[in-house]
């Protein structure tokens, strides 16, 4: 468990273009697709299409557009967000990549409005915009869960939007491959009546 600590004074960068994002995502997409073929997994066959990286890029790019209390129009988070420090067992460290977390399961704590959601979005974007993307981020907003759409359903729906066909073999491959990161945002926004069930799903 880590606490959201503070932000540094780094200069914000210009939003990355969809074309550049697709280009940067391509090596990881190709790697995962080839790995799935070697394991005989058929659920990612649509990833072979030359247009697929752009589709993934569009999904990731959507995480970059956010609304703030300062502007009436949506902004690119890259235009204003500064990487934070997280408190790793009493030691504050700057974090910009998912690879900074040694554990596979991490909980980030912070007060309301401190920027945890924006931080998770930035981690997803930075993973792809780095020159050595290791994992494809799967971003889930827990506030959208209902008694009819549980966490598993939300995950499956997001995977389907990535042109992944849902079957037991494919799901097993995805979460054993080490090439996907599940980012769950908004624990404090889960409907009270489904909190327990959601926590059990996570465990």
Regions found by a protein language model. Name each.
Residues 4-10, 15-48, 52-71, 75-203:
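P-loop NTPase signaling cores
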